[in-house]
Amino acid sequence: MAILVTGGAGYIGSAAVKDLLGKGETVVVLDNLVYGHRAAVDASAIFYEGEIGDETLVQKILDEHEIEACMHFSAYAYVGESVEKPNIYYENNFVQTLKLLNVLLKNNVVKFIFSSTCATYGEPQYVPIDEKHPQFPSSPYGWSKFMVERALSDYDTAYDLKYVALRYFNACGAADACGEDHDPETHLIPLILFAAQGKRDSIAIFGDDYPTPDGTAIRDYIHIADLSQAHLLALEHLRKNGASEFVNLGNGGG
């Protein structure tokens, strides 16, 4: 049987593909290459270029491969852009995901691992944030992910879809051949490195009134190698008939 990985040509998805292959899994990747890179996909994976909401294409993949589970990385993920273009975020991240889910369910693929985000929480009411923290996103990006979470919960109740929704905090780092290649780059750590290398004039860190020793912000980062392994653990959990879960992914510090 095979694992369908949507967004498998992206930053985190490509790392998960490599780790799945390393465990002897058969991997089928579906990516539209809007933000992903074909070269990032391990040559041992089976690759399809297209949209997750293309029901005909998804059905073709399911007809040609015995899919056991889906790891769903595919999403637009820029908070600022989501404010400027909320329509494409709700369409791609929510509507297209529902189309994907419906085809999977029609074919009895009922194991689903979802890349969610800490952005579903919005402004923290307390820290550290746990999975019981109230959710009220502050951006269309966060809302688009939150809406998928609500759909997953309802699909479990109605259709017995079993899922693990992993709420990432701040992904960073590189794993073997897999790393960041965003254009334009928006992640903090690469921007700091660009400034150190003289590739940009400076880096501005905003905010000086946070409740921290020096007033600046503290962020929780998690390495993509750890994120990838968390997805493999989620897959094993579902294979053992584990219950659906929402899980924060961070290191608990800053």
What is the predicted function of each stretch?
Residues 249:
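Conserved metal-phosphate-binding beta-hairpin within the catalytic cores
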Residues 126, 202-203, 246:
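A residue-level signal for beta-strand positions that form part of recognition/binding surfaces
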Residues 1-171:
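N-terminal Rossmann-like NAD(P)+-binding domain of SDR-like oxidoreductases, especially those catalyzing
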Residues 243:
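Short, small/polar-rich loop/turn modules that mediate ligand/substrate recognition or access, typified
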Residues 153-233, 253:
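NAD(P)-dependent short-chain dehydrogenase/reductase
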